[in-house]
Design a protein with these regions (language model features):
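Nuclease catalytic cores that cleave nucleic-acid phosphodiester bonds
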Residues: 2-10, 14-139
Length: 139
């Protein structure tokens, strides 16, 4: 049986507010925090080969997404919708088709994603994984 593609789905603001250095950037300007997180996730994707999807709460009329298929996929929720809802929908739609890992501090979101077959980790666990991978990549 072929190996299923691996995806990491990240609740962007959940991670930003859990990591002190990103929270500090968020206080200055939210775009700085988002860009710093995306850069780290891009590195993680490059090092591991695991595809990364990051979801942020947005303000627009529709769900926005990045267009480069080889880059980190970035989604913004539409007005009146939360990033949580998008993460849950992605887990529901793809949880049994792909190997999913969901990074969020939201307990309900973790429960929903887990019920859909995803492995759930906290932002702190994500930080640890990223540090381990970075250390191995530098050797």
């Amino acid at each position: 049986m072929p190996e299923r593609a691996r995806y990491l789905i990240v609740d962007g603001h959940s991670v930003i507010f859990a990591w002190p250095e990103l929270r500090k950037l968020q206080e200055r300007r939210s775009s700085l925090a988002r860009e710093a997180l995306i850069k780290r996730l891009r590195d993680y994707q490059d090092w591991t080969g695991m595809r990364v999807v990051v979801v942020f709460d947005g303000k627009g009329a529709h769900i926005g997404a990045s267009s480069d298929p080889h880059d980190v996929q970035i989604f913004y929720s539409r007005k009146g919708q939360t990033a949580d809802a998008i993460v849950e929908r992605l887990a529901s739609k793809y949880g049994h088709r792909f190997e999913l890992m969901v990074a969020t501090s939201d307990y309900l979101e973790q429960q929903t994603a887990s019920a859909c077959g995803a492995e759930c980790i906290s932002p702190e666990m994500l930080r640890g994984l990223m540090q381990q991978v970075r250390a191995c990549a530098r050797r």
